[in-house]
Amino acid sequence: MEEFQGYLELDRSQQHDFLYPLIFREYIYALAHDHGLNRSILLDNVGYDNKSSLLIIKRLISRMYQQNHLIISANDSNPPQNWGYNKNLYCQMISEGFAVIVEIPFSLRLVSSLEGTETVKSYNLRSIHSIFPFLEDKFPHLNYGSDVLIPYPIHLEILVQTLRYWAKDPSSLHLLRLFLHDYYNLNSLITPNKSIFSKSNPRLFLLLYNSYVCEYESILLFLRNQSSHLQFTSSWIFFERIHFYEKIKYPVEEVFANDFPAILWFFKDPFMHYVRYQGKSILASKDTPLLMNKWKYYLVNLWQCHFYVWSQPGRIDINQLSKHSLDFLGYLSSIRPNLSVVRSQMLENSFIMDNAMKKFDTLVPIIPLIGSLAKVKFCNALGHPISKSTWADSSDFDIIDRFVRICRNLSHYYSGSSKKKSLYQIKYILRLSCVKTLARKHKSTVRTFLKRLGSKLLEEFFTEEEQILSLIFPRASSTLKRFYRERIWYLDIFCINDLVNHE
């Protein structure tokens, strides 16, 4: 690791091409494997230490520089017999190594900001947990919103060119380009029917995609800041990036130079908000739909003219938040009125006023969750619980533990829901599916099995909060009901574990 730290220090002295030698360091690939950066082929091969060889990696890299090199497809089912090793394993190893190396410049910027030696130029370091307080605080005051699917380039060359600005190392990026073209089927990696966040995509492609998103968001951020405070100190990043894209012959002058004053006018509304999560974003505004339309067409033109990414404006709907719901991070989010009556008395006169307030409402999408449970055989398509036959051979403790873990994860994640009736239905399906699985294992009926165990089995499905409150308030059922209605955002949960992982 001392040698690794030595190479990192080169970036602090503004030396270029310092990443390229790291490609030929064996500890880079060991680091990528040991930390489990991507649960893929590397973690599924038990004999990794015996099969891996830096010599083979160097030979693969050398082949990419040969003019008449042997192109190996990742989907080739009949590899040459003289290779003598798992080509998919080593292609995956190189991909993981590239991901570690290319992330170094981004990590150094973050470390420098934490040490106080440099101010981070990127403003995309906010946690996903800040989204939920933002929605509760800001959304009730907004009127219109759009759920936008962020398009991603259909060709990896666009992603590599975008990365050139952030990682100024031509040698490494040239080798990365050769690797992507030679060892991957570009038509099958990124298609409109396959999300960039699919688990089959390596970490490297997530890094390339995030650099593309960071690039276009930095342009949006610049324009938004310039509308409120025109400061030269923050504009040098933007003009440096314009010069960079002029070098690679992008039509920047067509997008920015001609319409720059008009673009700044688009962003003058202080109530325009932008939220990104995974591959989607939300645009929301308090103003009329006219401003939302301007934002929509500006984003489409930015993607098409600046990044050569096709996007259809007709698929971006502008909805009134009080009448439509947004599918957001597994929730159905909307704004609903909360009516209250206030009685005021002044001397002998009394007044009754209707006070209407907007409230951010989050619901559990019951139909998609039942579909997910039916897909992994916890229930049928109608939501009727069935036994999990593949778990019937496990011990009783393992069966109960698996069901309890899934149930508590879902309860933990959807604790932010304003109405938990749908969540109770999901928990009921899991509980009864667990009982049917145990009854199937012991060759008994559900009724007989429940009589033998009593209520102890169902108590396992209570969350920690429910158990604590049941001990503190054993008879105060109103307290428990009030607790169930409260909305709690847990900061240690940002995604639902895929139910397939529990197989």
Swiss-Prot record:
Q: Look up the domain of life of the source.
A: Eukaryota
Keywords attached to this Swiss-Prot or TrEMBL record, sorted alphabetically, are: Chloroplast, mRNA processing, Plastid, RNA-binding, tRNA processing
Signal peptide from the UniProt entry: none
Write the protein's name.
Maturase K
Say what the protein does: Usually encoded in the trnK tRNA gene intron. Probably assists in splicing its own and other chloroplast group II introns.
Sequence similarity:
Belongs to the intron maturase 2 family. MatK subfamily.
Matching entries from PANTHER family are given as:
MATURASE K (PTHR34811:SF1)
GO MF, one annotated term: RNA binding
Instruction: Note the InterPro entries from the entry.
Output: Domain_X, Maturase_MatK, Maturase_MatK_N
Q: GO CC: one term?
A: chloroplast
Name its GO BP terms in alphabetical order: mRNA processing; RNA splicing; tRNA processing
* Entry's localization field: Plastid, Chloroplast
Q: Which Pfam families match?
A: Intron_maturas2 (PF01348), MatK_N (PF01824)
